[in-house]
Amino acid sequence: MPITHEQPNGFHSKQLNGSGIAKAKAMPYPSDLLSHFVKQHLELESYKNGQEIEIDGYSLSISAVSAAARYNAPVILRDSSTIRDRLEKARSVIVEKIEGSKSVYGVSTGFGGSADTRTSNTLALGNALLQHQHSGVLPSTTNTLSVLPLLDPIASTSMPESWVRGAILIRINSLIRGHSGVRWELIAKMVELLQANITPLVPLRGSISASGDLSPLSYVAGTLMGNPSIRVFDGPAAFGARQIVSSVKALEEHNITPISLLAKEHLGILNGTAFSASVASLVLSDVTHLAMLAQVCTAMGTEVLLGERMNYAPFIHAVARPHPGQTEAARTIWDLLSGSKLAHGHEEEVTIDQDQGELRQDRYPLRTAPQFLGPQIEDILSALNTVTLECNSTTDNPLIDGETGDIHHGGNFQAMSVSNAMEKTRLSLHHIGKLLFAQCAELVHPDMNRGLPPSLAATDPSINYHGKGIDIGIAAYVSELGYLANPVSTHIQSAELHNQAVNSLALISARATINSLEVLSLLTSSYLYMLCQAYDLRALQADFRQGLAEIVQEELRAHFSAHIESLDESPLFDKVISSMYKELNHTTTMDAVPRMVKVAGASTSLLVDFFMANQTSDAMSVAALTALPKFRETVALRAAAKLVALREEYLLGARGPAPASAWLGRTRPIYEFIRVTLGIRMHGTENLGVFQQGLGVQDVTIGQNVSLIHEAIRDGKMRGVVVGLFA
């Protein structure tokens, strides 16, 4: 009977078969993205606040990888007799094979396609492995170049430090499982690198992720050994870029003694998927955020486009078509629209005459958002589980069973699982971007946005093209996302004497997904910026409509009191103001004064018909009709003045930094975070004054404001706000 054993931290269970060999089981993750996102955030925050990441080979989470890689969270090894015993048994197998002159791949044989060579000089063999893998291209100097480069010499040739730190952590977690035959001392030395914040300078390119990420990991091994030709990042980052120095110098500065690797340990470090898994983990840590933010943006888009909450009704999704991702997206958006005064809460039945000319339902980018986002959520969850399992696996060859003494020659370094996870993630990022692009394109289009001005211009559109640059920019972003969505794994080439005839290209795929992540972050930032502008415009519209109604009522009485005093004026007023509201929606491309002339003129036929039908004499009808031009003129002048005054109040801050807050429900914290915390104001101040003070004096550029949102997404500040929506 199998014996079930719970790990102390409760994350993971494993089974021991009759011979005591541990059988790995996947760490349980929530089945929905929202629960995972919240759990991931809370875990990351705990690590950022000082909780130690304890490495045991079985419970490493994506949040822990992100915390150690990006926030320098403390890392320790679980120092248990069980772990040490497992390591010692596997190491003893290697020692016994060497002492018995047994042929073991990578210990007494050559590597890959050269595995037909033999040697008893195991240490020289290990050095030969590192020597040929130290073949990556890196800048030879950090001095100023005589010619301006086309790309940054460091960034274009070497990996970011976070990728390398994550890879070291994941490799530690693989080695401590006791299947690679390395010593505890080696694993502890790798932890020392993380604790001292010594990060090897690793080439960006050169791995096909077949026999693992051989070349990148060779630079980690070289650092541990104190190879003077291997350079590292060292020193504090508080006063500028970190220094790039020799590994020997860095180890000496931190009182770390270089380690002399023993037989199989060179290969044990190199033969794994740690870099692929590291980049994939860091990608997915942020992908969950963007996937949740896409649902938040869709809720916000539904509000500003005066859309239907019923698009996301449980009957459509949970009852009629219960795909789990679709159901989750609909439920999330539905909940976010709770309390909104902009989104329509219930579809009321109307007659054919009542909604003549009106769009009967929202367009696809809103109405089918759950169906579009749902499959992406499912693929992202699948990728999360795959990469988490990869981080808690032994990716090496050969593998040592310390219990039986058997050595298994296999291919656990083949990272195709990571490749597939990244391919589907990258495609999902494109689809998310496509949806947000479609929503934003609808938002800035005056024929589609239900009465908002073109390009969301808050002032006269003849000299305000506010969102046009963003409209173009997001088209560039989504186009690049489409290009990046192409699979990488279809470009696999045979390598290394045709031994690695199939390989995964997992690291290349993960790198491409990092690029997609960045581009989608830019697109999402741009859309959020426009959504906040649209919120303010809706609030301004509501104030203006109220003011217009008061003006119309006053002017009806002022110009036609003698003709309507004996009649119920309510039906007339309702018809007149309704016609003007409708004309407002059709004249958004016009400047204030001519627009209000046209809006006031929308009442003409209604008033003519009313007075012709309700006057007792021709003289009274003529008198009423004679007053019409003055009524229209006065309404137009007062309405234009009211609109300009409201624009000034909103743009100059009289209504506060977040004037639309009262209209929002659960999306309000996002809007207020952007408006209040980040300090991004409603756009249009310079246009209001017709650029009298020039450009850049009264406000920063549009791009600078979008950049603030992008930085908040990138550094995690926005993540906390999004989590708070669901607390």
From Swiss-Prot:
(E)-cinnamate binds at residues 271, 361, 367, 397, 468, 496, 499. Pathway: Mycotoxin biosynthesis. The keyword Ribosomal protein does not apply. One of its GO terms (cellular component) is cytoplasm. It comes from the Eukaryota. InterPro entries: Aromatic_Lyase, Fumarase/histidase_N, L-Aspartase-like, Phe/His_NH3-lyase_AS, Phe_NH3-lyase, Phe_NH3-lyase_shielding_dom_sf. Contains an active site 4-methylidene-imidazol-5-one (MIO), which is formed autocatalytically by cyclization and dehydration of residues Ala-Ser-Gly. GO terms for biological process: L-phenylalanine catabolic process. Gene3D superfamilies: Fumarase/aspartase (Central domain), Fumarase/aspartase (N-terminal domain), Phenylalanine ammonia-lyase 1, domain 3. It catalyses: L-phenylalanine = (E)-cinnamate + NH4(+). The modification 2,3-didehydroalanine (Ser) is found at residue 211. The structure of strobilurin A was used for the development of the major class of beta-methoxyacrylate agricultural fungicides since its beta-methoxyacrylate toxophore targets the Qo site of complex III of the mitochondrial electron transport chain and prevents adenosine triphosphate synthesis. Compounds such as azoxystrobin (Syngenta) and Kresoxim methyl (BASF) are among the most widely used fungicides worldwide. This class of antifungals are used as effective treatments against a broad range of destructive fungal plant pathogens and make significant contributions to food security. It is an enzyme of class 4 (lyase). There is a cross-link at residues 210-212 (5-imidazolinone (Ala-Gly)). The active site is at 105 (proton donor/acceptor). GO terms for molecular function: phenylalanine ammonia-lyase activity. Its EC number is 4.3.1.24. SUPFAM superfamilies: L-aspartase-like (SSF48557). Keywords: Lyase, Phenylalanine catabolism. It holds the Pfam family Lyase_aromatic. NCBIfam families: phe_am_lyase. Phenylalanine ammonia-lyase; part of the gene cluster that mediates the biosynthesis of strobilurin A, an antifungal polyketide that contains a key beta-methoxyacrylate toxophore that targets the complex III of the mitochondrial electron transport chain. Strobilurin biosynthesis begins with construction of benzoyl CoA by step-wise elimination of ammonia from phenylalanine by the phenylalanine ammonia-lyase str11, oxygenation by str8 and retro-Claisen reaction to form benzoic acid, which is activated to its CoA thiolester benzoyl CoA by the dedicated CoA ligase str10. Belongs to the PAL/histidase family. This is Phenylalanine ammonia-lyase str11. It comes from Strobilurus tenacellus.
